[in-house]
Amino acid sequence: MTDTRRAILAGGCFWGMQDLIRRQPGVVSTRVGYTGGTNDHPTYRNHPGHAEAVEIVYDPERTDYRALLEFFFQIHDPTTKDRQGNDIGTSYRSAIFYLDDEQRRVAEDTIADVDASGLWPGKVVTEVTPASEFWEAEPEHQDYLLRYPNGYTCHYPRPDWKLPKRQATA
């Protein structure tokens, strides 16, 4: 492996997101944390405006940003604002924190494909916003579902979920 790339995604409680994303081919490492908020050095008990997020390091020779986003849209409901399952509030919003213009373009294009697909009953409300500082969460939140396999999660892969690309317009 010569180089790696990063992605930062938020889609509800970071425990379930990390557990599923870490298993994807090409994912080298993950860590959970907080981003997109107003305070420095946020904690689980004090992270105003921050989303619970997962920082993903991946091998671009084995996967790409689009594939990660397609899986992201499969494992959480991107049509509910500030909510995933029983978790409610801005901490649990759906967001893509892009690191460069190419990630922004791919994110917007993927969202358009999700909206056009009809796979979700409503319109995607996922935020696409520039990445800011990613603050690593406390150790007890890292790899939580590896340590507590029956712990809480509201994330799961949807069977037979395949995102088609929109038809090009003439």
From Swiss-Prot:
EC code: 1.8.4.11
Keywords: Oxidoreductase
Keyword check for Methyltransferase: no
Protein name as it appears in the record: Peptide methionine sulfoxide reductase MsrA
GO MF annotation, one: L-methionine:thioredoxin-disulfide S-oxidoreductase activity
Top class in the EC scheme: oxidoreductase
HAMAP family: MsrA
Catalyzed reaction equations: L-methionyl-[protein] + [thioredoxin]-disulfide + H2O = L-methionyl-(S)-S-oxide-[protein] + [thioredoxin]-dithiol; [thioredoxin]-disulfide + L-methionine + H2O = L-methionine (S)-S-oxide + [thioredoxin]-dithiol
Gene that produces this protein: msrA
Biological role stated in the UniProt entry: Has an important function as a repair enzyme for proteins that have been inactivated by oxidation. Catalyzes the reversible oxidation-reduction of methionine sulfoxide in proteins to methionine.
Superkingdom of source: Bacteria
Active site, UniProt feature: 13
Organism name: Nocardia farcinica (strain IFM 10152)
This protein's record includes keyword Nuclease: no
GO BP terms, alphabetized: protein modification process
Record-linked InterPro entries: Met_Sox_Rdtase_MsrA_dom, Met_Sox_Rdtase_MsrA_sf
Family: Belongs to the MsrA Met sulfoxide reductase family.
